[in-house]
Structure formats: structure tokens, C-alpha cells
Amino acid sequence: MAYWLCITNEDNWRVIKEKNIWGVPERHKNTIAKVKKGDKLLIYIKQENVNGEVKPSRIVAVYETASEVYRDSSRIFKSPKGMGNETFPLRIKLKPVKIFDRPIEFKPLIPKLKFITNKRKWSGHLMGKAMREIPEEDYRLILEYAT
């Protein structure tokens, strides 16, 4: 089993929660191809301005993959600025494990996370990625903060 940090925004988090589907652009096909049924996915929402309020980067849920990767270009996700008409066609069905009552703010975790080797420029470990594999140790650490 592998553990993944899935990077999204507020709008697409609503879609994930409602439809139990994760999708990535074609350019991330090599990454999503490594995901197997039963893997655990942590949903990470990037810092963004929502209705005039800056919401910090945070982890909002954990899911288990319930399918292999499949292709579907139907427009269910909202294409973020700068991504044109992206439909996130490479998708995986999800099964919710836990949607956190209180999101876990990400920045306080940075000093403790093994996968973030450059603690000062930590966003470089996530920037431009749709998802990235993380060590089981980091997954467990994050879940400790969810209680």
C-alpha cells in the first residue's frame, strides 16, 4: 500500500467529496499510474483566497482508492485559472475513510514531515504536482493531528 498527498483547491474539493472521484491532468499520467487500489490518499487544499478570506493550506480528508485508474473527460471538476479547459481525465474512484471535522493546517506539520527536505522552501515539494507519494511515517503523523 502506498500513501499519497493529493493537491487540489476548494472548488474541486467539493467535487471530490460529492462524487468520490480524484482526477489529474494527462501530464500527470506517470504519477497516477503508480496508484493502486487500496492506497490511501490525503486531500490537501492549497492556500487560496475564498470570498475575501485567505484560507491556509490544509489537509481535509483521507480516502482509499476504490478502483484502478480510468479515463473520463466529462466536465465534473472546475478548471483552475491558467489551466484552460482541463477536465482532469485520469481518474480514480474513492472510498471515504475520514473527512476531518477540523482541517489540519499544513504549515505547522512541515518541520516534522520527512518528505519535505527543504523546510524553508517547502512549497517546491508540491508546486506543479497533482499528487505525490509520501512515506507511511508522514501519513501516520498527519493522521495524529486529525484527532
UniProtKB/Swiss-Prot annotation:
PANTHER family: UPF0310 PROTEIN MJECL36 (PTHR39661:SF1). Belongs to the UPF0310 family. This is UPF0310 protein AF_2356. The lineage of its organism: Archaea, Methanobacteriati, Methanobacteriota, Archaeoglobi, Archaeoglobales.
